[in-house]
């Protein structure tokens, strides 16, 4: 390939034609450029070709090459089609394949800037450059008719988005229409009745595939014959359409379901207060949508925009400011991330170039430090007398030399006014006494004449100026807060005596409410309270505010289903630093994190610690944390690694979440946004459990007494084994899934050799078929004895009956002998050998037995975990033992079903394991008071270990879901199985610890003979 004669930056973006001759245009690379600065970008685009090699183009460029030069190079190459008239509609998208992270690249960006800003965030091979049509003319359907290449490219792009995002959501009728339109367009030369022939339709199914045209879900829901007939009938409606007509019909049909010519962003408009809206950006301008049923409201047209600016905020958020002609102030839009703001800025700037008269960019980039020093903000022009009055008011009482110059830019005249008249508030009874003064119940009459029940915090008259400022600091913070689970501030009276008026909640403090109603409150409600407070803390986290006093005494109950966080007396903003260092003041030591106790350092991470302690209070029905310790001893306990014990009713998953919040390293604690998601999952799980229990109680079926289930005799030791062909396994040769031998030894019916192969010979399991096990000889017709009379027939029937009774007696006797042999061998054999015995339960032939001379030799096990057999005790009414059995069954079910389940189905089997573990720990907690105190430490430690095992299993499950479509899928599944096996082993260890404690307490009994 050779370069064009002049740089592509000089080529006008008008009608682009492919140059004459075989040469293909490329970005010009100067001769003196070093090799390190030269790059080859692989840019993908859409086409009709099934050949992946024709759907991308390699572009050679340098780090100084601009994105618009790369776009122009592809359009000039003719790879997507000839005679492109609407080159301004195209843009370049950078997409991360694993996380779906998207960055729209501005035409003026250079390759080096893209590399430094975006590509360095992930591995280079995980990024993909896509050529997309992003900016559409106002009447795009008519405009695209003049540019056939752009029309077909936009159709391919839109159809690709439809198959990936909308195909499974539209109705069957619409999916059928859109699929037949593509079928007609794709096979434009096919006769209208071609699909009526069965051979043609089968050729379409086998050679091309219906997945290219119709969603897979639709094909699975319909019968093949019915689906074929529907396609034939619908295709007849579009058989006479030409290619362009099919495209236009596709646009019009899909437009009834999705917006094909605009992009929608969920963001907040900053207009004195924040309004959450859907911002719609398309050819008609920038519009806002407050609800799905409402009509969009126009905020600005692209011709009115004069500047675009992106400003980063804390916690990854950003503000997009649009300077609009004739508007007194910029339109400010708050987004969840800087990348989203930049994508919106590129979209708006592209439409301004397309519809405006200028070709330049309206985006104003942040200035460098040197530029900032050369430009100072304008001095505010205030009235001289006003400035003098401010200076006189701000003078210090003790000095006439220093004065504070007020910052006029911080004044917000448009904000809500919280000053109210004292005569509008009537005080009633005293609710309690705080650090600064009494708290009263009262009634406030607003300007509309409405009476509102309020709580009034008062400040003592003899309070010092410093304490008064601390008292008022709570109101200063609360007036900026607006959240459904944060106490609402009504107003402030700053004159002496100072009052802070807040909403009154009739149920009072959460701590007292929990104590009064602990017999009626359910775990589901307690988890709901924790979730609501977590949402409030996530809101405080988003505005860089630390609370520093999260406890049930500072939470008010608005209703039995709603709580609100209050008491912001210790709250502080952390704007300049990421932490707040407290001065000498009274602090809640038993709720605080180690770094807060040691260094008076308060961050969002320390609030996470306190929130977990508050959750512990809620699940303990208002008990004070570390009530058995004095304040001075708390830090020593925390430094040793001890934490608050699990409350009795606390779900294991929730306690695991608490322990994560109590990590000594603040950086390892989860953020509140993550905790909201985790608590939502726990709440949904508890809700499902409650609904299931209610359903079982409502529709409980009567118990039916059934006879004891017949169990087949266990395999005898002398039966020979065979070696069939190897059996494939999800675990692969690298990972062997082991069932604890002790569990199998103490419960032979837990797992049968036929169903769960052991790791020793799981690759050599004999195929066991029911028709082979219970095989009997057939008889010819002449073998039957023909009775000559009715009496003879009766005698033959009696003889057959006696014979069958003898056979049954013999089998029953053998079964008793086999059972006695099994109980004897359990004591001498290694339990794993019994579990791994793969001999069939009943051989095909009862001959050829080898003489039994002793127990079979234990096969070698490399790297297996040594597990002692479980104690041989009486397991009647032993709930711990039964729950351990259930847990192992749940783990085995996970192991067997993991390879068949889709990624979203992993949650079901893991949830089953979690629920079973919860029952196990609950049964241990019920038994714990009757066990010796010397054994409780080991049992509680094993319980904590099981909670950590479950958390690890959940983490591995999420990892497996994230990598379901990558090459790491099998490895993640193996890690998930390893975590589940560890959980089963630790459950067996818990059973052993409980058995030992029961023996010490004389609660264990040998099994009855």
UniProtKB/Swiss-Prot annotation:
It is found in: Cytoplasm; Cytoplasm, Perinuclear region; Cell membrane; Cell junction, Focal adhesion. Residues 39-359 form the FERM domain. SMART domains: B41 (SM00295), TyrKc (SM00219). ATP binds at residues 431-439, 457, 503-509. The modification Phosphotyrosine is found at residues 402, 579-580, 722, 819, 834, 849, 881. Transmembrane segments: none annotated. The modification Phosphoserine is found at residues 361, 375, 399, 762, 839, 866. Non-receptor protein-tyrosine kinase that regulates reorganization of the actin cytoskeleton, cell polarization, cell migration, adhesion, spreading and bone remodeling. Plays a role in the regulation of the humoral immune response, and is required for normal levels of marginal B-cells in the spleen and normal migration of splenic B-cells. Required for normal macrophage polarization and migration towards sites of inflammation. Regulates cytoskeleton rearrangement and cell spreading in T-cells, and contributes to the regulation of T-cell responses. This is Protein-tyrosine kinase 2-beta. It comes from Homo sapiens. The gene is PTK2B.
């Amino acid at each position: 390939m050779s370069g064009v004669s002049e740089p592509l930056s000089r080529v006008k973006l008008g009608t682009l034609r492919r140059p004459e001759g075989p040469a293909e245009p490329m970005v010009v690379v100067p001769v003196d450029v070093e090799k390190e600065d030269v790059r080859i970008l692989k840019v993908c685009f859409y086409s009709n070709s099934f050949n992946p090699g024709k759907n991308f183009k390699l572009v050679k460029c340098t780090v100084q090459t601009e994105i618009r030069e790369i776009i122009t190079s592809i359009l000039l190459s003719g790879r997507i089609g000839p005679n492109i008239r609407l080159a301004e509609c195209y843009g370049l998208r950078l997409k991360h394949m694993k996380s779906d992270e998207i960055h729209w690249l501005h035409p003026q960006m250079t390759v080096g800037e893209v590399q430094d800003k975006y590509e360095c965030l992930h591995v280079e091979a995980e990024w993909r450059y896509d050529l997309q049509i992003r900016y559409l003319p106002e009447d795009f359907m008519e405009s695209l008719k003049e540019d056939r290449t752009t029309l077909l490219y936009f159709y391919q792009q839109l159809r690709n988005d439809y198959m990936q995002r909308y195909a499974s959501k539209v109705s069957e009728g619409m999916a059928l229409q859109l699929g037949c339109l593509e079928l007609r367009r794709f096979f434009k030369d096919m006769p209208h009745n071609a699909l009526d022939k069965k051979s043609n339709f089968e050729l379409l199914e086998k050679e091309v595939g219906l997945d290219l045209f119709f969603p897979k879900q639709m094909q699975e829901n319909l019968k093949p014959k019915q689906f074929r007939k529907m396609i034939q009938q619908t295709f007849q409606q579009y058989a006479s359409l030409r290619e362009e007509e099919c495209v236009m019909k596709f646009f019009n049909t899909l437009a009834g379901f999705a917006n094909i010519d605009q992009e929608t962003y969920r963001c907040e408009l900053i207009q004195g207060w924040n309004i959450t809206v859907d911002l719609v950006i398309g050819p008609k301008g920038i519009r806002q949508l407050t609800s799905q049923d409402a009509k969009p409201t126009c905020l600005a047209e692209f011709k009115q925009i004069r500047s675009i600016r992106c400003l980063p905020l804390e916690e990854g958020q950003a503000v997009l400011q649009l300077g609009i002609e004739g508007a007194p102030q910029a339109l400010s839009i708050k987004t969840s991330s800087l990348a989203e703001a930049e994508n919106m800025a590129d979209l708006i700037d592209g439409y301004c170039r397309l519809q405006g008269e200028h070709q330049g960019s309206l985006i104003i980039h942040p200035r460098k430090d040197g530029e900032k020093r050369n430009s100072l903000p304008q001095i505010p022009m205030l009235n001289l007398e006003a400035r003098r009055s401010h200076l006189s008011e701000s003078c210090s009482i003790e000095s006439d030399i220093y004065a504070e110059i007020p910052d006029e830019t911080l004044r917000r005249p448009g904000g809500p006014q919280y000053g109210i008249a004292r005569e509008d508030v009537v005080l009633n009874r005293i609710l309690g006494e705080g650090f600064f003064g009494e708290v009263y119940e009262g009634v406030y009459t607003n300007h509309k004449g409405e009476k509102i029940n309020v709580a009034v915090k008062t400040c003592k008259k003899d309070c010092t100026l410093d304490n008064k400022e601390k008292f008022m600091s709570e109101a200063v913070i609360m007036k900026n807060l607006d959240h459904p689970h944060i106490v609402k501030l009504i107003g402030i009276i700053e004159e002496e005596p100072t009052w802070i008026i807040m909403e009154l909640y009739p149920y009072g403090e959460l701590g007292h409410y929990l104590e009064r109603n602990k017999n009626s409150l359910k775990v589901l409600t307690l988890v709901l309270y924790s979730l609501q407070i977590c949402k409030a803390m996530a809101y405080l986290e988003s505005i860089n505010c630390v609370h520093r006093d999260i406890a049930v005494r500072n939470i008010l109950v608005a209703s039995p289903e709603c709580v609100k966080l209050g008491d912001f007396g210790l709250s502080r903003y952390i704007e300049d630093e990421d932490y707040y260092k407290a001065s000498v003041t009274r602090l809640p030591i038993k709720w605080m994190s180690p770094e807060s106790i040691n260094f008076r350092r308060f961050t969002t991470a320390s609030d996470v610690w306190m929130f977990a302690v508050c959750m512990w209070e809620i699940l303990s029905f208002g008990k004070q944390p570390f009530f058995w310790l004095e304040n001075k001893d708390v830090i020593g306990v925390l430094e040793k690694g001890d934490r608050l014990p699990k409350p009795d009713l606390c779900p294991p998953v929730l306690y695991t979440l608490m322990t994560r919040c109590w990590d000594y390293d603040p950086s390892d604690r989860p953020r509140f946004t993550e905790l909201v998601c985790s608590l939502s999952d726990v709440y949904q799980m508890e809700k499902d459990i409650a609904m299931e229990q209610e359903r079982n109680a409502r529709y409980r079926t009567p118990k039916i007494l059934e006879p004891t289930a017949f169990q087949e005799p266990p395999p005898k030791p002398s039966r020979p084994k065979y070696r069939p062909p190897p059996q494939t396994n999800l675990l692969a040769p690298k990972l062997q899934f082991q069932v604890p031998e002790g569990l199998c030894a103490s419960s032979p019916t837990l797992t049968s050799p036929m169903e769960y192969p052991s790791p020793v010979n799981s690759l050599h399991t004999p195929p066991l078929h029911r028709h082979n096990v219970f095989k009997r000889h057939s008889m010819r017709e002449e073998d039957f004895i023909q009775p000559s009379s009715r009496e003879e027939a009766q005698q033959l029937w009696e003889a057959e009956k006696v014979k069958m009774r003898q056979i049954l007696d013999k089998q029953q006797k053998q079964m008793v002998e086999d059972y006695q042999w099994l109980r004897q061998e359990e004591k001498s054999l290694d339990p794993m050998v019994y579990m791994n015995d793969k001999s069939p339960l009943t051989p095909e032939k009862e001959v050829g037995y080898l003489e039994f001379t002793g127990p079979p030799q234990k096969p070698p096990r490399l790297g297996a975990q040594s597990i002692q057999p479980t104690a041989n005790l009486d397991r009647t009414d032993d709930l711990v033992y039964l729950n351990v059995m259930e847990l192992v069954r749940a783990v085995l079910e996970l192991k067997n079903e993991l390879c068949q389940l889709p990624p979203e189905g992993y949650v079901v089997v893991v949830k089953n394991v979690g629920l079973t573990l919860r029952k196990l720990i609950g049964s241990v907690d019920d038994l714990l008071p009757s066990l010796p105190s010397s054994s409780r430490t080991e049992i509680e430690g094993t319980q904590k270990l099981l909670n950590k095992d479950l958390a690890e299993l959940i983490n591995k499950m999420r990892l497996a879901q994230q990598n379901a479509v990558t090459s790491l899928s099998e490895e993640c599944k193996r890690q998930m199985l390893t975590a589940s096996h560890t959980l089963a082993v630790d459950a067996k260890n818990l059973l052993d610890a409980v058995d030992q404690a029961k023996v010490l307490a004389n609660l264990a009994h040998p099994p009855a003979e």
